[in-house]
Amino acid sequence: NYASDGWFMYASPVLSNAPLPSEKTRALPISCFLTYVPDSLDGLIDHSAELRWLSVKGGGVGGHWSDVRAVSDKAPGPMPFIHTVDADMTAYRQGKTRKGSYAAYMDISHPDIIEFLNMRIPTGDVNRKNLNLHHAVNISDAFMRAVERDEMWDLIDPNDQTVRDSIRARKIWETVLETRYRTGEPYLNFIDTVNRALPQTMKDKGLKIHGSNLCNEIHLPTADDRTAVCCLSSVNLEKYDEWKNTPMIRDLVRFLDNVLQFFIEHAGDEISRARYSAEQERSLGLGAMGWHSYLHKHRIPFESDIAKEKNIEIFDYIKTESVIESVQLAEERGECPDMEGTGRRNSHLLAIAPNANSSI
């Protein structure tokens, strides 16, 4: 009764893509996919086919383009390939409910970063513009230090590690900020910060985060053989006082683990990398909504110390309960391979998604 009581809401793909007993499974209950784009013709073609299937299956996609070689007299660079994704998103819908959606990620050190930053500005060569996509820039600690010190910043081709150009870091930063002012994007993704937060067992396996997903609420490793998967749902913080000290959080973690298992069992070979990643890491994304409603209901100023204390209290409670249930699931069903030796079933547990539809 948690959903009917307004204590939590399913993510849209969980709610809309659950098949009826007699219905064939077409779309899947997964909100987020994170893909890696290799620097090869085979990899680019595979990525194009995979993201079409992922979109049809019902999920939004984040694509990580930082390793694709820069434009040269022998290579077109990543932008024309990203443009094909732009066209795909108008054709391949997310399951039954909404059009395809995609966010491209690129490192701040890539030689094509300026063109990438400007790809949503509707002037210039239309064949290299991408008005139907979202985009994000991976910002490193070294770049921010270069901005702080007003140093030059090297743009390095990922193919041969040669320096293609050197530009004032502050000039690039100004372009980022101006583009955000004009278009609302790119997202700012602090790539070193998220890699430091990766579970140690995953670091020990040589795994690395190359970017995030469509909505930037979760960071998971991607590689040639891994397309990361995360299934979402969110609790309603407005009714926190009603559901705290109930078994709801633990029940929801168990529920999402079951949803992930449904995906693993029904994902076809056309999205085998996503199925493999889900089996290895079993990432969940239990989120939250209604924080402003809780504060308004209790007449707590948004920026007050009381609000900060309550925020810490609530999310500490959610995290603690989630970890307890993941440990319990590991005892019952086994650890996932990426968390072997930790006593946990899931490598990730919490993710605060946008909740546009869920909030309604």
Show which residues each predicted segment covers.
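Extended catalytic cores of very large enzyme megasubunits
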Residues: 1-360
